[in-house]
Design a protein with these regions (language model features):
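Acidic, metal/ion-coordinating pockets
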Residues: 10-34, 46-292
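Short, low-complexity patches enriched in S/T/P/G
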Residues: 1-10
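Juxtamembrane extracytosolic/periplasmic "stalk" immediately C-terminal to the first targeting helix
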Residues: 39-41
Length: 295
């Protein structure tokens, strides 16, 4: 209804503008006809006035001023990697009770820091679920209680695409996705995509700004996409898929955030391949590229 009202107003402005031009033309024609019929009796001074009336330009309506741009600001933080080794979940188990894990003390000192941002984004490096026993290096699985602590400290956006996404096979993917789907409505997660359509698009609106999120990885520790899984990651070399996803999402968001889990393990040096890929992503339409080094 609101859109239709705006459309009607826009049409009215256009109609008034057109009528103004047409009415002006008709008035000029009326003056010409009247002066022509009295031509034999008018004075020279009147003839001069007639000429001025005929040559005076038609007054056009003033153009509608352009609206002033509205500046909307979103304060954004990005953190990673949240990699939960055995020692961390064992400490949480010792603090917890009734079979639960208490991860809150591990993050509590960061609460004030993250409170200063409108959006807190996190690369969750390990699978999170309660269907698998917790495990650390090299094949990780993290108790679901960790999301209570992460939510408590202020994280609302979670990337799940990284080199440990396939650590527990198809079952791990399904369990982790189910866990994140059960989070509160203000939580968004991305990184596992339907392997047929790849159209699992995620948006978030903050302070009037719509943000779109995509997450990719360079590797999955040598593990192939699990057999029988409907969902999986998108690798950074799948450019046809990435190009389509960006093309689909770009018209629907003000800012498009793309995260990349990549690099040489143990190195902070940016490679030429990373630079080339980042430029390509920007050329496709990415506004912000989050680079997660593989260390």
């Amino acid at each position: 209804m609101s859109l239709r009202s705006h459309e009607a107003a826009a049409c009215a402005v256009i109609a008034i503008g057109v009528c103004g031009v047409l009415v002006g033309s008709l008035l000029v024609e009326s003056m010409r006809n009247g002066q022509s019929s009295a031509k034999a009796t008018v004075s020279t001074a009147q003839s001069t006035e007639e000429i001025q009336a005929q040559t005076e330009p038609t007054q056009m309506p003033a153009p509608t001023p352009e609206p002033e741009p509205v500046v909307q600001t979103v304060h954004f933080s990005a953190t990673g990697d949240n990699l939960i080794h055995e020692g961390i979940y064992n400490q949480a188990r010792a603090r917890g009770s009734d079979g639960h894990y208490d991860f809150i003390p591990a993050y509590e000192n960061l609460r004030d820091f993250y409170a200063g941002f409108d959006v807190n984004w996190l690369n969750q490096e390990t699978l999170v679920n309660d269907d698998y026993e917790p495990s650390g290096y090299p094949m990780f699985s993290t108790p679901g209680d960790i999301t209570n602590a992460l939510y408590n400290v202020g994280f609302r956006v979670f990337s799940l695409s990284n080199n440990h996404s396939y650590d527990k096979g198809a079952g791990g993917i399904a369990s982790s996705m189910a866990h994140w789907a059960a989070m509160p409505d203000d939580v968004v997660s991305m990184g596992f995509y339907n392997l047929e359509t790849y159209d699992d698009y995620v948006y978030q609106t903050v302070n009037g700004v719509t943000i779109g999120y995509l997450s990719y990885t360079e590797m999955t520790n040598g593990l192939p996409t699990p057999s029988g899984s409907e969902y999986g990651v998108v690798y950074l070399d799948q450019r046809d898929v990435i190009e389509k996803q960006i093309t689909d999402m770009r018209p629907n968001c003000d800012v498009l955030v793309v995260s990349c889990h990549w690099g040489v393990e143990g190195s902070h040096t940016v490679t030429d391949a990373q630079r080339e890929t980042a430029q390509w992503l920007a050329d496709q339409g990415a506004d912000l590229i989050l680079s997660l080094i593989h260390i």
